[in-house]
């Protein structure tokens, strides 16, 4: 949520909506997210980074209970005003036979007891009201395969952050198209934003023709998975290396940025230049000096993410103005 948190907040402030959206059962980044407090016990995590036996959607993870009981707890935070309360609480799962679920909301003594609907496709269980926290407990859960929970409103803007660390983006070509279309029925995405590339930047690689080919294939597959969604690709951010004691932009960053532009142009999708928004060449030095990025001269901090989110939001709003004006002329 380094970039997404402030982007989500800005969109919801302007267009309505509340909540962090989809949250996987757990993840390696769970304890670092300031937008949600979460804890999970009694689950086996499967990731498409290491597993080829399960079918995956955008989160790239699926979860199966281990032991007699499994649980999920989530609690909203006040990091942003739009996160404090939500009106919809959902549990998303993609396989089930006869799981018994107990749900406690807002720390009350009242327990909701349900037998989850049997399914072999992506399904959601929903409660509506006013929520700040929830505790899910599962028993007799053999055969259950869970995705996560969603905290949101059913109106306004929902921004889901599907983060899978160590992912170059090309792995999205392995998304299961049937599963993704099932997901799209209950979470109909209007826009899919692809932000990848930083972890493949290397001093030893300046030719990214192979990347262009693979990412074109990936974009085509994402379109098959989410045919009603527009796609926006974010270019790689700046990354510095030290040369004679001075930090400067790695040449590979510029090479990859050119490759990403080619992918977007050839695929007919929108493109936004994060590198340019940072200030262009050697801008990472300024970000580190301002504590907007870590001293590895690679990774943005939450404060740096806020700068990029603000620039992205302004760019989208500017494009919206153009479309609104064109619509007026057309009328």
Residue ranges of model-derived segments:
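Ser/Thr-glycine-rich phosphate-binding loops at phosphate-binding pockets of nucleotides
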Residues: 1, 235, 301
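Conserved SGNH/GDSL esterase-like catalytic core that processes O-acyl groups on lipids
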Residues: 2-213, 299
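Stable alpha-helical elements in mature extracytoplasmic
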Residues: 3, 7, 176-180, 211-218, ...
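Structured segments of extracytoplasmic/periplasmic soluble domains
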Residues: 6-17, 152, 182-186, 195, ...
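Hydrophobic/aromatic beta-strand patches that form the interior of the parallel beta-sheet core
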Residues: 160, 232, 270-272
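Conserved, well-ordered alpha-helix/loop/beta-strand core segments that scaffold catalytic motifs
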Residues: 191-197, 215-223, 230-235, 239, ...
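Catalytic His-Asp segment of secreted/periplasmic serine-dependent ester chemistry enzymes
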Residues: 238-331
């Amino acid at each position: 949520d380094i970039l997404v948190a402030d982007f989500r907040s800005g969109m919801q402030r302007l267009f309505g909506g509340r909540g962090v959206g989809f949250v996987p059962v757990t993840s390696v980044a769970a304890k670092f997210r300031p937008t949600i407090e979460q804890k999970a016990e009694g689950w086996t995590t499967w990731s498409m980074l290491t597993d080829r036996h399960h079918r995956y959607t955008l989160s790239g993870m699926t979860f199966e209970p281990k032991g007699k009981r499994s649980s999920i707890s989530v609690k909203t935070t006040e990091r942003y005003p739009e996160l404090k309360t939500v009106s919809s609480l959902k549990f998303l799962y993609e396989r089930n036979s006869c799981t018994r679920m107990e749900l406690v909301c807002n720390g009350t003594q009242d327990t909701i007891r349900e037998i989850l609907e049997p399914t072999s496709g992506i399904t959601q269980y929903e409660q509506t009201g006013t929520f700040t926290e929830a505790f899910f407990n599962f028993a007799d859960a053999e055969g259950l395969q869970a995705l996560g929970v969603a905290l949101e409103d059913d109106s306004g803007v929902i921004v889901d952050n599907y983060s899978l660390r160590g992912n170059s983006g090309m792995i999205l070509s392995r998304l299961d198209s049937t599963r993704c279309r099932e997901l799209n029925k209950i979470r109909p995405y209007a826009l899919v934003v692809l932000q990848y590339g930083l972890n493949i930047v290397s001093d030893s690689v300046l030719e990214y023709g192979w990347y262009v080919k693979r990412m074109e294939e990936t974009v085509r597959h994402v379109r098959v998975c989410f045919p009603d969604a527009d796609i926006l690709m974010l270019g790689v951010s700046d990354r510095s290396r030290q040369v004679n004691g001075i930090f400067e932009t790695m040449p590979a960053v510029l090479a990859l940025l050119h490759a990403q532009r080619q992918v977007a142009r050839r695929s007919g999708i929108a493109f936004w230049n994060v590198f340019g928004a940072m200030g262009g060449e050697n801008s990472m030095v300024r970000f580190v000096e301002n504590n907007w990025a870590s001293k590895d001269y690679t990774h943005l901090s939450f404060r740096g993410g806020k700068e990029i989110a603000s620039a992205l939001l302004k760019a989208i709003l500017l494009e919206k103005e153009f479309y609104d004006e064109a619509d007026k002329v057309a009328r």
